[in-house]
């Protein structure tokens, strides 16, 4: 079991990266160096460095600047919509890095909640995706208005549903795997469930509180997202799988695509 100070360093670097966007590349480099060094000496903190590095990598990928056409509404219904493709490419990079870290540590997907799911579990996840997605798509703009101001989005164009689903599933798969998969599970090893839940929720909330076009203070967004992180974490621990958190998260992300890629001129 690593010492408290030693085990706390990667978490401090993670929270710094989440709160201060310009620090993310530097914190990612520090965490990768820490991961390589701790793997070489077979230190138990290797899992912490690996988990935190993967989360910061997802933040960096999510923050990559997109072309102007991604947000002007002109590519809203295109299957090649940049807003969807950029996120899908980032998700593939992050999930590939997750596989690499798992292999380096001799771990398996089942250890982080990536496991075979029963037909009943698949049906539940699909049902949640459809039900929550429909509700979120039509009431999401109204709920988001206090945080981001009016969102003049076009929701009636069903041809935009395919790129919206691509964006939503890619983003949810990436974030749930790193936050509720590796981070939650591996922080639990050294710090226990309560600290792990708090750490992943805090990082999740802080990461969503920077770089946005907020109508006022970002603090309500940070708080709401952190509460969402707690809920997703509880579901992941309760079910032992990431499929239901991914489905619900993806459903909630569908209106985010519309709000960013389908803005009216």
Predicted features along the sequence, with ranges:
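Membrane-interface helix-boundary motifs at transmembrane edges
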Residues: 37-50, 111-118, 184-189
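Juxtamembrane helix-loop-helix connectors linking adjacent transmembrane helices
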Residues: 70-91, 96-171
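Transmembrane helix-loop-helix hairpins at the membrane interface
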Residues: 7-29, 126-265
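N-terminal, membrane-interfacial amphipathic/helix-forming hydrophobic leader that caps
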Residues: 1-106, 257-265
